[in-house]
Design a protein with these regions (language model features):
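Extended amphipathic secondary-structure runs
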Residues: 382-400, 462, 466-475, 479-482, ...
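Short coil turns that connect the paired helices of HEAT/ARM alpha-solenoid repeats
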Residues: 16-21, 65-67, 107-111, 149-154, ...
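HEAT-repeat alpha-solenoid elements in large eukaryotic scaffold proteins
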Residues: 22-41, 69-82, 113-124, 153-164, ...
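HEAT/HEAT-like alpha-solenoid repeats
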Residues: 3-15, 47-61, 91-106, 134-151, ...
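N-terminal "cap/leader" segments of large eukaryotic alpha-helical scaffolds
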Residues: 1-38, 536
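Solenoidal tandem-repeat scaffolds enriched in leucines and small polar residues
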Residues: 130, 154, 171-176, 184, ...
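Alpha-solenoid helical repeat scaffolds
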Residues: 39, 43, 84-89, 129-130, ...
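Long amphipathic alpha-helical scaffold regions
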Residues: 58-64, 68-70, 78-84, 90-92, ...
Length: 598
């Protein structure tokens, strides 16, 4: 075999007309050419190679007129390969390739045969890659009619979608393509194959972006997509959400604004009703992107919907989803949500107060609690986001209903208790340690209306739970530590007398007995009351191997030992808190605990 100056072999194919050579020889030569091209054996930088390839263009074109199916199949593959070469001869040969390939399809009359499948793939490559490859309108109509029955045939979908993508990419416009795209939209939803759904979404998105869409036509498409966000099968819903995500990202803002209301309501219903976590997450992400793409006026329209839903007292599910959307808004807009922040906080406060009303009913129905906890949990979660973005909201007097938050510390559902404790922890982290005023906090204080002793008592009650989670236990310890530091800052008239051993032994048997007497005795010393309260729980906590109460006491002792200089006490050598409990209690419980943790 001859070679180029660089030493690379050159492949010669001799054709003197398809009627003069045996068909098998012609098919073999075409197959040899296709194999050489597939293995990159042609050096396009070599003028000699290009000159020889130039002479092959009309020869390959002649094979498209062969009557033998094997020769025709190899010739179609060769035409697909040769158009990728930088050859001048292709300028006049490409239209011939296109016309003859369409004639082959017309002669066959269906897409079932191997030759027809190869012809479709070849035509798709030529139309896609060559700008001078034109398709007449009547031929385009014929192709679309030929493709329609095979859109859902698994064995032929690859070639069908290949030619369809090529047609859409070249923006060939005939009325029939709009009808075909309606079919593609349906297949995108109903087909169970992820690969087919991806092909449909790709073609449909390109069609929506590049083709003229009248308002009526586009609205019909958007309504179809919005409706099918509630399709019966998860795969179909996810396919629709994938396309909606691309639409919201790539459409012009003016178009998104026109259909924002329609899409927003559909997506919110997905969050409210869909049993698939993936669908709900995708809908939330699309809503987030939707808020970012909209102008102020359209954004305000959506917020008005959310406010309306948040005010639905009798429909807790609608209230819940409204609160969730507020959280999505915060995630999307961050500091740009300030315009809507006052109304948002009003809605959240209103629903917290409603929840308090439910809790204070004398005969509460458990099913009501079950339906209410999600609303409250999401409210506290959203308020946590608000405080992270706008810290002044937490410390501004009478902005948030903190008293209502405290009322939920003993809510029947653990998630709500956790969210309420975490929210209080955020508040405490922003406030300096200060002595609680005896007459209560003023209306100008962030803690207005709150009673630290009441909060501490609720936290202590939570610590008794056998189902206390480590996360909630840690948050309670943090909150009690802040409250304890505030109590430590309080001035006391003198040390509290220790409890006698007899009373202490009684308390060990029944920790709740005598609490009222201790509270009365410790009314001027809240820290003593708190230590007494926790000391009753430490013994049972050790037995149950729940260490939150012990951790809390340990932190108090270490804090007092390290920072309360006026006491001038040393942990481990003497009782630093002689007025908190008896010396026996210090020696048997607190001293070993503090020495262990210090």
């Amino acid at each position: 075999m001859p070679s180029t100056p660089s030493g690379e072999p050159v492949l010669y194919l001799f054709f003197s007309g398809t009627h003069r050579r045996p068909r098998s020889f012609i098919a073999f030569g075409l197959d040899l050419f296709n194999t050489a091209f597939r293995r990159n054996r042609f050096d396009f930088g070599d003028p000699e190679v290009l000159a020889r390839l130039e002479s092959m263009v009309p020869v390959i074109g002649n094979t498209l007129y062969a009557s033998n199916s094997h020769v025709l199949n190899q010739g179609l593959k060769a035409s697909t390969a040769i158009i990728k070469c930088p050859l001048k001869e292709l300028e006049k040969s490409v239209p011939v390739f296109v016309r003859q390939t369409i004639d082959i399809l017309k002669e066959i009359g269906s897409t079932e045969s191997e030759v027809a499948q190869t012809a479709l793939k070849s035509l798709a490559m030529i139309v896609r890659d060559k700008a001078n490859a034109e398709v007449k309108e009547k031929d385009l109509v014929y192709l679309l009619e030929l493709l329609a029955p095979d859109l859902e045939e698994p064995g032929r979908q690859a070639s069908v979608f290949a030619i369809l993508r090529a047609i859409v990419a070249r923006k060939f416009i005939v009325p029939e393509i709009y009808d075909l795209m309606d079919r593609v939209s349906e297949i995108m939803v109903t087909n169970q194959s992820p690969q087919v759904q991806e092909l449909c979404r790709s073609v449909l998105l390109q069609f929506l972006l590049d083709y003229p869409q009248g308002k009526g036509c586009l609205r019909t498409t958007m309504a179809f997509l919005a409706k099918n966000t509630a399709y019966m099968y998860e795969s179909g819903r996810i396919s629709v959400l994938e396309l909606l995500s691309a639409i919201v990202s790539k459409f012009e803002e003016s178009l998104i604004g026109d259909y924002a209301d329609l899409l927003f309501v559909a997506l919110v219903m997905v969050i409210a009703n869909d049993d698939s976590a993936k669908s709900r997450e995708m809908a939330a992400e699309i809503i987030k992107n939707l808020f970012l793409r909209l102008d102020v006026d359209h954004r305000q329209l959506l917020v008005s919907h959310v406010r309306s839903w948040a005010g639905q007292k009798e429909n807790s599910q609608l209230t819940r989803v409204a609160v969730q959307v507020y959280g999505i808004m915060l995630d999307a807009l961050q500091t740009n949500v300030s315009t809507y922040l006052p109304s948002m906080i009003d809605d959240l406060n209103l629903n917290i107060l409603r929840s308090v009303e439910q809790l204070t009913k004398e005969e509460e129905d458990q099913t009501d609690i079950d339906s209410q906890w999600q609303v409250v949990y999401h409210i506290f979660t959203v308020l946590g986001k608000v405080i992270r973005i706008y810290p002044d909201v937490a410390t501004r007097p009478q902005r948030l209903s903190w008293t209502a938050v405290v009322e939920h510390l003993l809510f029947p559902h653990a998630w709500v208790r956790m969210a309420a404790a975490r929210l209080l922890g955020q508040l405490f982290s922003m406030l300096p340690v200060a002595e609680p005023p005896k007459d209560g906090y003023s209306t100008t204080s962030p803690l207005a209306g709150l009673n630290l002793k009441d909060i501490a008592e609720k936290h202590c009650t939570q610590l008794k739970s056998s189902r206390l989670s480590p996360t909630l236990g840690l948050q309670i310890v943090k909150n009690l530590f802040y409250i304890g530091k505030c109590f430590c800052a309080a001035k006391v008239s003198g040390p509290q007398p220790a409890m006698d051993v007899e009373n202490e032994n009684e308390d060990e048997d029944d920790p709740g007995e005598g609490d009222s007497e201790h509270e009365e005795a410790n009314s001027d010393n809240p820290l003593a009351w708190l230590f007494s309260k926790l000391s009753y729980q430490i013994r049972s906590a050790y037995i149950a191997r729940r260490s939150c109460s012990a951790d809390c006491v340990s932190e108090f002792c270490l804090y007092i030992d390290g920072s309360h200089s006026r006491a001038d006490r040393k942990i481990g050598t003497s009782n630093p808190l002689p007025y908190f409990a008896s010396s026996r209690q210090w020696q048997t419980t607190w001293r070993p605990l503090c020495c262990k943790n210090s």
